[in-house]
């Protein structure tokens, strides 16, 4: 089944990318996108940011006002600041609760769309061969392993194919990361070398 073959490979790529980037990073990016949408949560986020700016501004005005020379003005600013801070904390708690609900929903959806879907496919298509091997191409013992646990003899099961995809994706991903690190290393070395030379020249001038 070519479509199943590609689906399993694609799922393994997605799982590797999420694990490499980090689930928390992915959740954070999705949250930033979510609060840009026209929803009630985005309205709460905008109000929270506005209240935060107001609190910071009032605090700055309080710092610029002498509590001794301009006590009446300072006291008025203090009352406004305390009231704004209380409103900000209430709105921030509301946004925090919304984010907790969002994070829980995203975690469930992410697991269902990746690892959960993979488990479902492995169970549902456990008897379905991914592809058939040429007759007599490999010993029957190897054929039995490749068809494990329930695929017909002489075929490759979805479990074996999924494991092979995960291994290859991990190897390719690690190779790409190593290549990027190798390419970027000379630039970093040149920067360090330039900084060292500047330091030596500065000492000579002194």
From Swiss-Prot:
Residues 1-4, 132-155 are lumenal. Residues 25-110, 173-206 are cytoplasmic. The keyword Chloroplast does not apply. GO terms for molecular function: protein-membrane adaptor activity. One of its GO terms (cellular component) is GET complex. The chain crosses the membrane at residues 5-24, 111-131, 156-172. One of its GO terms (biological process) is tail-anchored membrane protein insertion into ER membrane. Keywords: Coiled coil, Endoplasmic reticulum, Membrane, Transmembrane, Transmembrane helix, Transport. It holds the Pfam family CHD5. Its main location: endoplasmic reticulum. It is a multi-pass membrane protein. InterPro entries: Get1, Get1_fungi, Helix_hairpin_bin_sf. It is found in: Endoplasmic reticulum membrane. It comes from the Eukaryota. Residues 75-100 form a coiled coil. Belongs to the WRB/GET1 family. Interacts with GET3. Required for the post-translational delivery of tail-anchored (TA) proteins to the endoplasmic reticulum. Acts as a membrane receptor for soluble GET3, which recognizes and selectively binds the transmembrane domain of TA proteins in the cytosol. This is Protein GET1. It comes from Ajellomyces capsulatus (strain G186AR / H82 / ATCC MYA-2454 / RMSCC 2432) (Darling's disease fungus).
């Amino acid at each position: 089944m070519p479509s199943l073959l590609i689906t399993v490979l694609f799922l393994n790529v997605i799982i590797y990318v999420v694990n490499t980037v980090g689930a928390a990073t992915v959740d954070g990016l999705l949250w930033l996108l979510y609060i840009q949408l026209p929803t009630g949560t985005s309205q709460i986020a905008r109000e929270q940011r506005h209240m935060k700016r107001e609190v910071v501004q009032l605090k700055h005005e309080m710092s610029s006002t002498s509590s001794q020379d301009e006590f009446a003005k300072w006291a008025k600013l203090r009352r406004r600041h305390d009231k704004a801070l209380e409103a900000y904390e209430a709105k921030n708690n509301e946004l925090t609760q919304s984010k907790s609900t969002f994070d829980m929903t995203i975690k469930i959806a992410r697991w269902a769309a990746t690892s959960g879907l993979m488990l479902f496919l492995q169970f549902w298509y456990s008897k379905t061969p991914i592809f058939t091997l040429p007759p007599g191409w490999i010993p029957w013992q190897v054929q039995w392993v490749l068809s494990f646990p329930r695929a017909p003899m002489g075929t490759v099961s979805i479990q074996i194919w999924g494991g092979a995809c995960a291994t290859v994706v991990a190897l390719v991903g690690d190779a790409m990361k190593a290549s990027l690190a190798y390419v970027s290393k000379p630039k970093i070395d040149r920067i360090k070398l330039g900084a060292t030379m500047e330091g030596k020249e500065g000492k000579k001038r002194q």
